[in-house]
Design a protein with these regions (language model features):
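Conserved ATP-binding/catalytic segment of the ANL
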Residues: 200-260, 265
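Conserved C-terminal "lid"/linker of ANL adenylate-forming enzymes
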Residues: 258, 283, 291-294, 326-366
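C-terminal boundary motif of the adenylate-forming
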Residues: 239, 278-302
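Adenylate-forming
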Residues: 213, 247-276, 303-318, 336-341
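Conserved AMP-binding/adenylation subdomain of ANL enzymes
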Residues: 8-25, 32-121, 129
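Gly/Ser/Thr-rich phosphate-binding loop
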Residues: 74-77, 87-177, 282
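Active-site glycine-centered loops adjacent to acidic/histidine catalytic or metal-binding residues
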Residues: 137, 160, 184, 238, ...
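Conserved ATP-binding loop and adjacent catalytic segment of the adenylate-forming AMP-binding
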Residues: 52-55, 124, 128-129, 142-191, ...
Length: 366
């Protein structure tokens, strides 16, 4: 149960992230049924006298571009999955199709220059007047974050949970103290802490306190008691750590951590980010299957079609199997031994997701 006061307090906190003048145009991409869009995409604009344009249908990149070209917004709120698709099909596809450019982009200085130019094209994609790209609803792939930084696109990562109305942490625009890879610091009037942190990594459950924290779960006192601990601190169910400056780093969901027989904790989201960075991977999910780590991969059919057009089914499958084996080898080289993938399976359809494009992991757990 979220009160009027909870939502208003959170909208006030969000207003400290960027100065919004009356008449500023927002484009709403996420559904209003989600607390992030309701607070940051509706209440915040109303609080500041802004105008909101709604997509009104499934927000594919083509539809987002169309409405942005028409409305020319200064603020766009998106889910990471949409950004990943734009990045793969409008940025990385150019490197794959131009071998010379792909070769030279292995050099950091040239890659930064390429990304800067790609950033200018993405500014046009969003209508040419973008002042803020607000990213929330799920974790952002680190590779996408590096691109946004090198492309000089104005973006803010937000972190929150519905029980907190939902915003808990974000990186105020222009704050040099925001650490790359983090979701920024606690927003105004919110306190964060890590419960029972690991002595070596500092990772533990993220807990929050503030005027935005829920009243409880409707007609469920037991669940409320489990979620709200002493002095109104909320157990978020997310794992993370805080650095000395107060930057919050998200590691994954408490209930999605894979504990191997060796006692090692595996955070599947971190591995999935690496898999999803592959151009032929649309999305992926890592799970445990009889003591080993298994990756389910839903391939990008358009990408594969462009490279196997005219091939018969067996040859197409052989090509995909080779890609998957190379991907497993490459990803495993960047992972600790305990986190390496033992098997990769092709998943035949998109994974079932929430309204904010988070995979419903519980449907695929064995």
């Amino acid at each position: 149960m979220l009160s009027h006061a909870n939502f208003c307090a959170n909208a006030q906190s969000a207003s400290g992230l960027i100065a919004l003048a009356p008449g500023t145009v927002f484009v709403s991409v996420l559904p209003l049924s989600h607390a992030y869009e309701f607070t940051v995409g509706l209440l915040l604009p109303l609080l500041c006298g802004c105008r909101v344009a709604y997509v009104g249908r499934t927000p594919t990149p083509a539809i987002v571009q169309k409405i942005c070209s028409h409305e020319r917004p200064q603020v766009v709120l998106v889910a990471p999955l949409i950004l990943e698709e734009i990045y793969k099909k409008r940025v990385m596809a150019q490197l794959e199709n131009n071998r010379t450019m792909g070769f030279f982009c292995r050099f950091d200085s040239i890659r930064k220059l390429f990304f800067r130019k790609a950033g200018l094209r993405l500014m046009d994609f969003f209508g040419g007047r973008l002042r803020l790209l607000g990213i929330g609803g799920a974790a952002l792939n680190p590779e996408i974050e590096r691109f946004l930084l090198q492309a000089s696109l104005p973006f803010v990562l937000g972190y929150g949970v519905s029980e907190a109305s939902p915003l808990l942490a974000a990186g105020p625009v222009g704050d040099p103290g925001i650490a790359p890879g983090s979701t920024g610091k606690a927003v105004r009037n919110v306190r964060l802490r890590i419960d029972n942190p690991d002595p070596e990594t500092g990772i533990g459950e993220i807990q929050a306190q503030g005027p935005n924290i829920m009243q409880g779960y409707l007609n469920d006192p037991e669940a409320t008691k489990a979620a709200l601990v002493e002095d109104g601190w909320l157990r978020t169910g997310d794992l993370g750590r805080l650095d000395e400056a107060g930057n919050l780093f998200i590691c994954g969901r408490l209930n999605s951590v894979i504990v191997l027989a060796s006692g090692e904790n595996i955070y599947p989201e971190a591995i999935e980010h690496k898999l999803n960075a592959m151009p032929f991977v649309q999305e992926s999910l890592v799970r445990e299957n009889m003591g080993i780590l298994e990756a389910l991969v839903y391939p990008d059919a358009d990408w594969l079609d462009s490279r196997t057009r005219g091939d018969h089914r067996a040859k197409r499958q052989e090509y995909l199997n080779r890609l998957l084996n190379e991907m497993r080898r490459e990803v495993n080289e960047s992972l600790p031994i305990s986190s390496r993938i033992n098997r990769v399976l092709v998943w035949p359809e998109p994974f079932s997701k929430t309204a904010t494009h988070r995979i419903k992991r519980f449907l695929y757990t064995l």
